[in-house]
C-alpha cells in the first residue's frame, strides 16, 4: 500500500534522537579501473592492507581524538568481508606494531600513546564450520595476546566472557576504563558490534568491504 509516514535520518538527527555522523571516502588504490573491474585478490594483497592500516593508525589522529591527550582518545572498529580477512588484518597489524613492515606507527602518534594501537578481533567460532579448526587456533592466539595485554585469563571455553570484556573496553562506561592501561583502541570484526552497540567513546567505523546494507550502517 501507500506509505503512511516517513521519518528520515536527517530528521532524527535534527530532533536529537540519534547522533550525527560524517562519511569520508578514502582511496587506497591507484588505478583507472572501475571498482567492479578490480579483482577481489587485490583487496587481499598485503600492500593494499598496509595502506588501509596506515590510514587508520597514522592518518586518523583527529578522528580518534589524539589532540585530547593521553587516555582521552576515542576508539574504532574495522569491519571487513570475512573471518580470514579479519585474521589477516590482525596478524599484519601485529607486524606493523613490531616494526616489521614498511608502514610504521608515526612518532606523533607514539608521543601520545607509545602502545598504540591496542587491538583485538572478535568473530563467531563454531564447531560446524569447515575451517573451524583454523579459526579456533587463531582465536587461541588472539586470547593469549589479549590476556597478556590486559592481564586477563580468557580461554576458548569462555569466549562469551571475552566478548563481554571487549564490549566493555570499547564502551568505557566504567571508571577503570578511563585509564590508558585498560583501554582498547581498535576491534576488527566481520559482522559483530555493528548494530545496537552503545559505545560513547567509539568515534569511527572503518569499512573495508563491499557496500553494506543501509540498515546495518545506520544502526
What are these regions (language model features)?
Residues 40-189:
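Conserved C-terminal RecA-like helicase domain
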Residues 1-40, 49, 194-219:
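Signature of the SF2 helicase/ATPase Hel1-core->accessory helical subdomain module
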Amino acid at each position: 500500500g501507500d506509505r503512511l509516514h516517513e521519518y528520515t535520518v536527517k530528521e532524527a538527527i535534527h530532533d536529537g534522537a540519534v547522533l550525527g555522523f560524517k562519511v569520508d571516502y578514502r582511496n587506497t588504490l591507484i588505478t583507472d579501473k572501475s571498482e567492479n573491474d578490480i579483482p577481489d585478490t587485490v583487496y587481499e594483497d598485503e600492500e593494499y592492507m598496509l595502506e588501509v592500516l596506515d590510514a587508520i593508525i597514522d592518518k586518523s589522529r583527529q578522528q580518534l581524538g589524539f589532540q585530547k591527550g593521553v587516555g582521552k582518545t576515542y576508539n574504532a572498529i574495522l569491519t571487513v568481508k570475512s573471518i580470514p580477512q579479519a585474521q589477516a588484518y590482525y596478524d599484519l597489524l601485529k607486524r606493523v606494531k613490531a616494526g616489521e613492515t614498511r608502514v610504521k606507527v608515526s612518532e606523533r602518534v607514539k608521543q601520545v600513546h607509545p602502545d598504540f594501537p591496542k587491538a583485538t578481533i572478535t568473530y563467531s567460532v563454531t564447531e560446524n564450520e569447515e575451517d573451524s579448526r583454523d579459526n579456533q587456533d587463531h582465536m587461541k592466539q588472539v586470547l593469549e595476546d589479549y590476556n597478556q595485554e590486559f592481564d586477563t585469563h580468557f580461554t576458548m571455553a569462555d569466549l562469551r566472557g571475552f566478548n563481554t570484556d571487549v564490549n566493555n573496553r570499547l564502551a568505557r562506561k566504567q571508571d577503570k576504563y578511563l585509564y590508558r592501561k585498560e583501554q582498547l583502541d581498535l576491534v576488527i570484526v566481520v559482522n559483530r558490534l555493528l548494530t545496537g552497540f552503545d559505545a560513547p567513546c567509539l568515534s569511527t567505523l572503518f569499512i573495508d568491504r563491499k557496500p553494506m546494507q543501509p540498515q546495518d550502517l545506520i544502526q
